[in-house]
């Protein structure tokens, strides 16, 4: 399903299911970005039609600019494993630069969107999406779990990384 980058096939510009999701994205002004194509298919089968996925492991700047044409908000909904969370973090820089509002849905371990929907149902998944924290809340929580909040060094790292994230936004 996930072909390599070639001169003919530019993964950084392809968004899986954008053709099927465009109307729903325009209507809701929001797009759910899943990590993989099977997660996107599971969302569509569950009636969540504003779901798409990037080609490759993270959303690119080109893909963020395409999504900006249709949506005001992006909800990242990547897998709960380490690779999924790292892909979400890699996507954030380009999303911040795009000017889109960003929220990050955290899927409980050991799930991905597909398995979460199968086990808990579409309504539980929609609730997870609706309650997804904003980007800065997600980042602060992530940094607090990554760095020692009981040491000055850890708190300084958190402050510096939060500052760096704020500086990447297009807001003055």
Annotate each predicted stretch with a short phrase:
Residues 99-172:
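C-terminal or mid-to-C-terminal helical accessory/interaction module adjacent to the motor/catalytic core
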Residues 74, 82-102, 106:
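Phosphate/diphosphate-binding loops
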Residues 10, 32, 52-56, 80, ...:
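Glycine- and other small-residue-rich loops at beta-strand/loop junctions that grip anionic moieties
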Residues 22, 68, 92, 114, ...:
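Generic hydrophobic alpha-helical scaffold/packing signal
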Residues 64-67, 93-95, 130-135:
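Flexible glycine/proline-rich, aromatic-decorated loop/lid segments
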Residues 38, 59, 79-88, 106-111:
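Acidic, metal-coordinating catalytic cores used for nucleic-acid/nucleotide bond scission
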Residues 1-70, 74, 87-88:
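Phosphate-handling DNA/RNA-contact segment within nucleic-acid enzymes
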């Amino acid at each position: 399903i996930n072909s390599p980058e070639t001169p003919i096939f530019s993964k950084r510009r392809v968004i899986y299911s954008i053709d099927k999701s465009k109307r729903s994205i325009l209507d809701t002004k929001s797009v759910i970005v899943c990590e993989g194509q099977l997660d996107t298919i599971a969302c569509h089968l569950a009636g969540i039609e504003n779901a798409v996925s990037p080609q490759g492991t993270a959303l690119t700047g080109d893909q963020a600019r395409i999504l900006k044409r249709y949506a005001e908000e992006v909800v990242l909904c990547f897998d709960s494993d380490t690779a999924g969370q790292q892909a979400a973090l890699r996507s954030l820089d380009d999303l911040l630069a795009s000017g889109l509002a960003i929220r990050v849905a955290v899927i409980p371990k050991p799930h991905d969107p597909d398995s979460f929907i199968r086990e808990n149902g579409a309504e539980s998944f929609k609730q997870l999406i609706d309650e997804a924290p904003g980007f800065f809340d997600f980042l602060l929580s992530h940094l607090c779990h990554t760095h020692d909040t009981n040491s000055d060094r850890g708190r300084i790292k958190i402050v510096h990384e939060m500052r760096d994230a704020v500086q990447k936004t297009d807001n003055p």
